[in-house]
Amino acid sequence: MRTRYFISFFVLAFVCCIGLFYNPEFAAPTSVNVNPADIAWMLTASGLVLLMTPGLSFFYGGMVSKKNIISTMLQSFVTLGVITVLYVCFGFSLCFGESFHGLIGNPLSFFMFKGVDLNTHPTLSPGIPFLLFAIFQLKFAIITPALITGSFAERVKFNAYLLFICLFSIFIYAPLAHWTWHPEGFLHKWGILDFAGGTVVHMSAGYAALAGAIILGSRKSFQDQQHVEPANIPFVILGTGMLWFGWFGFNAGSSLGANTTAVLAFATTVVASAAAMMAWIFFDAIRGKKVSAMGACIGAVVGLVAITPAAGFVTIPHALFIGFAASIISNLAVKAKDKYHLDDTLDVFPCHGLGGIVGMILTGVFAKDVGLFYGHTTTFLYHLLGLLIVSVYTFGGSYILYKLTEKVVPLRVSLQEEIDGLDYTQHGEVYKLKKPGQQ
């Protein structure tokens, strides 16, 4: 293990030292069509989206068993470091560099943020500095692999996880971002609408989570049908609040300016999430369950996921329906996965995968002026085709990447390590769970 970390350290040191020899000229700002209000809002939005990753750490960390809180939180939190370095080197170029037939960007277009300066970009960021656009997009790349971690919580090796998220970011996330958000991307040219990442972020994370749950297999506690109590439900509530707050930057910030589209996205975000939260707890109550804080939090997040692709394209009433529909479908899926003995630990696929799918389909239905609801079929049909392509690519590609990772380093901890808990066996950090004097 020390050898693998030595190699990782050497690679990081090499990348960081490139700056001593490779220091592209940073152009002075010359753009005159930049609105300071747009810059102020996008700086704020970038900070809000960054907050979502620590929020996700609390959200996931509170759901797992006490012996796995730290490991689960760290798996989300560490993406802030890993993905940032990767994105500066190649990730941004793969997402938004010179397009190769609408499939992927040239990895050297913006190597080490070359040419990413304080001026606007004519197609990608005509109203804000290109550097600000890149930093905003970086936050999306950070949280996407973090979302996956909930599916294989309590049983994945940390070093294997680090390798997988690097591969995922390069071979899954970057192509999807290019297809969908680059002006030359083929999904973008088809007219497929993804305002803030329902497809790029949530569907990709959901399908990668599904593949991960299948390949890593179920936990021992799941096999033994042991009920695992959430470690800290207040953590879950705190994480939900941080996610909800950050999501305003996620969705409204995707307007790339302080404008009326941002206002609409802000409003639809809060409305859809509220509808989804209430739908989840009422639906649970109808089925004989007690109204729970966990249910309210999960429902709220499902609504946020579902409205993400539609936030700037739909009306307030349609946002209510999108949140409601996604909540019911995800709730049913959580129950259904247990029947198939699928140990997706924190229900990532039912919540993010299906939430993103519902949002993508209903965006094709309700998108103002071009949706099925307004008498147009083209956008809706392309959304269905895009859904098929993205589903096959993300699930199949992620499955292959897990297998490749397994060839390099085992994905799963040993049975004894799982029993002892990953906080101790992977990180050597544990809560004191016993009273002083107890063995």
Predicted regions and their residues:
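Hydrophobic alpha-helical transmembrane bundles of multi-pass membrane proteins
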Residues: 1-439
